[in-house]
């Protein structure tokens, strides 16, 4: 039987019979920081390395990787993002890696565990003048992890985005 336990900003998924374990940090962008499936370690805790320096297993949105000089053009309009990788003059990995997600749904039974998390951003950011909401759904089974991400544009204008998942 799967169980889901929450302790402050950490969700743990367990199934002793199937050797499944997962640990999600709500206050680190809903990142999956540990994962074992069928007794095999897939994602290992990187302690003593700090999450803020590694972005380990973080969901990357609205852009993955680096935007050189933080500059991009969309619909013939130029935008300037804040530079958060100063030594290389890049905007890096988007905006949600340090945001706190809210638990919307938790379901656990003998075959799987499902967790749905939500983050709503109503603040306009430098270089990204759009609002959005994000749903992240993790489904754990004995031999698989399924990750679904749903982005809803809550603005009146279309916006560019990509989604990535940091190793």
Please place each PLM-identified region on the residue numbering.
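Surface-exposed acidic/polar loop and edge beta-strand patches at domain peripheries
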Residues: 1-150, 154-163, 167
């Amino acid at each position: 039987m799967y169980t889901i336990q929450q302790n402050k900003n950490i969700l743990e998924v367990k199934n002793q019979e199937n050797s499944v374990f997962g640990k999600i940090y709500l206050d680190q962008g809903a990142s999956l920081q540990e994962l074992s499936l069928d007794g095999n370690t897939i994602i290992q805790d990187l302690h003593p390395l700090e999450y803020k320096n590694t972005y380990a297993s973080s969901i990357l949105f609205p852009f993955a990787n680096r935007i050189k000089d933080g500059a991009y053009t969309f619909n013939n309009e130029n935008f300037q993002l804040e530079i958060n990788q100063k030594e290389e003059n890049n905007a890096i990995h988007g905006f949600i890696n340090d945001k706190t997600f809210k638990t919307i749904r938790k379901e656990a039974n003998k075959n799987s565990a499902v967790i749905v998390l939500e983050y709503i951003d109503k603040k306009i950011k430098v270089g990204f003048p759009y609002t959005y909401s994000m749903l992240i759904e993790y489904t754990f089974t004995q031999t698989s992890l399924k990750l679904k991400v749903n982005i809803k544009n809550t603005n009146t204008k279309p916006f560019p985005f990509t989604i990535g998942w940091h190793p």
